[in-house]
């Protein structure tokens, strides 16, 4: 699909409006298909590498249909509105869909004692392999949003049989955190969700965690520094960021596709210019951060893009 075909409706061009409407507005204005779609979804418990993850499976009518896996963004879940929207579009188009929930996300903080962090590549690779085994497939599609897009690119490096599509992926974690911290709106949003996750973790494992000291930390940067120092084995914040920084030659020879917007308020488009030529980068003028809201029904052009992308690669 030509990336130039995205044209938001009148009044929907502002990138911050796009991003906020996609995240908040779609939780309020629910599509007519949502209740029936989620009712038919099947939960799958995934136990890999000593961890307990979950996914939601949305089966196509054809047992032999191709599989597409979806990875949500940071502090999202398999039931995030944008994930459900893409899953519904793909399932309606004839694909099996597996919506993975990363550790601790989506109300799963009580399933594992250890805390999630964004450098847990091997755990997510193992989960993808588990899902592909469930569907008895040697190849599959994978789409990830934002931090999930970063995971999708890392998985493409280790599982070359995947047809990976990363929507507005974080390339430089440090710059992404700094960009979030530069906006009061985005910083408060992520701070609230992250603190909520830690509160769930403490409630599930009170003998292991006491996050009371984090309440005095008022920025995403200081909270990240606290988390890395107190709850991971990384030597420092720079070592943590480096573990999933995708700049330089990290993705050399990896075949994957990136869809992103020049007006993304969280991930600067310039981050994609240095990616190796094996990564097919498609940049639109507008779209915000993983939003691409095309009309006032809050439908996303990303769903159209995903349908065309995976139909070309998995149905040919």
Which functions belong to the PLM regions below?
Residues 252, 257-260, 264:
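Short beta-strand/loop motif that positions the catalytic acidic residue
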Residues 287-301:
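Catalytic histidine-centered segment of alpha/beta-hydrolase-like enzymes
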Residues 87-89, 103-141:
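Catalytic nucleophile-loop/oxyanion-hole region of alpha/beta-hydrolase
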Residues 76-88, 269-270:
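The serine-hydrolase catalytic nucleophile loop
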Residues 140-231:
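Alpha/beta-hydrolase-fold enzymes
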Residues 226-250:
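Active-site nucleophile elbow and catalytic-triad environment of alpha/beta-hydrolase enzymes
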Residues 1-60:
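An N-terminal hydrophobic leader/cap segment in hydrolases
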Residues 65-73:
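Short beta-strand element of the alpha/beta-hydrolase
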């Amino acid at each position: 699909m030509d990336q130039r075909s995205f044209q938001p409706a009148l009044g929907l061009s502002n990138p911050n409006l796009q991003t906020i409407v996609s995240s908040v507005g779609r939780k309020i204005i629910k599509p007519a298909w949502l209740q029936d779609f989620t009712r038919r979804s099947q939960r799958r418990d995934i136990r890999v590498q000593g961890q307990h993850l979950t996914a939601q499976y949305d089966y196509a009518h054809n047992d032999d249909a191709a599989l597409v896996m979806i990875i949500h963004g940071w502090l999202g879940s398999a039931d995030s509105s944008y994930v459900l929207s893409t899953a519904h579009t793909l399932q309606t188009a004839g694909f099996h869909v597996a919506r993975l929930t990363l550790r601790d996300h989506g109300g799963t903080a009580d399933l594992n004692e250890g805390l999630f962090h964004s450098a847990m590549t091997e755990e997510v690779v193992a989960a993808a392999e588990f899902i592909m085994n469930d569907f008895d497939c040697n190849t599959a599609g994978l789409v990830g949003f934002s931090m999930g897009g970063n995971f999708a690119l890392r998985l493409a490096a280790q599982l070359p049989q995947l047809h990976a599509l990363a929507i507005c992926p974080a390339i430089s974690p440090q710059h992404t955190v700094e960009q979030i911290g530069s906006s009061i709106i985005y910083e408060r949003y992520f701070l609230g969700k992250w603190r909520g996750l830690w509160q769930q973790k403490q409630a599930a494992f009170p003998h292991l965690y006491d996050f009371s000291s984090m309440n005095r930390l008022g920025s995403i940067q200081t909270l990240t520094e606290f988390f890395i120092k107190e709850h991971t084995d990384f030597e420092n914040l720079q070592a943590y960021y480096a573990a999933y920084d995708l700049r330089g030659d990290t993705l050399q020879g990896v075949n994957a596709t990136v869809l992103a917007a020049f007006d993304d308020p969280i991930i600067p488009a310039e981050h994609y210019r240095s990616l190796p030529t094996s990564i097919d980068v498609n940049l639109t003028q507008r779209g915000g951060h993983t939003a691409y809201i095309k009309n006032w029904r809050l439908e996303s052009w990303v769903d159209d893009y995903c349908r065309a992308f995976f139909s070309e690669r998995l149905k040919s």
